């Protein structure tokens, strides 16, 4: 019996590879060297176009891919970890402005800025805590026998998040757009 999703469902694995190669051909697939057996894609995107930031991204499959077991799994079964720039660093830089804007940490949390940026969540990765892009509410992620959210679709949503986040960071959009949630 195969333990990992890509062994037990080689057709899904091939579909994932085909989608990424079609839409994000510069990304490469590898296996984490932490003993977990998890696969990940790594590459760079610049969704804001020339002159915008280039983002180095890892898309990390959970071993449960494509099955989402609860409505609390933000980001679904493909976690999106920006390596450069690092979200935690950006969030730490933004936190004084967030506190100035919202007055208290509790008020910042109430408005969705508890971590310093909209639509991110924290999780352990290796030996440190990292901030991941939350591309959609978990209830919108697909994960059953007939359909699932792919790395390519998760990265597409992440690119939209990056554009909106860059606009917000540059002052080109307000908090209400950043918190809209319809990424």
Label every PLM stretch briefly.
Residues 1-183:
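UBC/E2-like fold recognition across ubiquitin and ubiquitin-like conjugation systems
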């Amino acid at each position: 019996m195969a333990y990992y999703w890509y062994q037990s469902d080689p057709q899904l694995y091939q579909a994932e590879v085909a989608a990424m190669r079609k839409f994000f051909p510069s990304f490469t697939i590898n296996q984490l060297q932490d003993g977990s057996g998890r696969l990940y894609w790594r590459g760079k995107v610049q969704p804001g176009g020339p002159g915008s930031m280039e983002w180095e991204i890892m898309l990390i499959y959970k071993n449960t891919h494509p099955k989402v077991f609860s409505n609390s799994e933000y980001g679904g079964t493909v976690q999106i970890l920006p390596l450069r720039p690092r979200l935690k660093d950006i969030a730490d830089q933004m936190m004084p402005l967030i506190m100035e804007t919202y007055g208290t940490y509790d008020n910042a949390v109430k408005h969705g800025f508890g971590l310093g940026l909209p639509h991110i969540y924290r999780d352990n990765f290796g030996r440190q805590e990292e901030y991941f892009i939350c591309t959609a509410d978990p209830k919108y992620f697909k994960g059953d026998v007939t359909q699932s959210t792919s790395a390519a679709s998760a990265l597409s949503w992440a690119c939209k998040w990056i554009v909106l986040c860059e606009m917000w960071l540059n002052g080109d959009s307000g908090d209400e757009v950043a918190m809209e949630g319809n990424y």
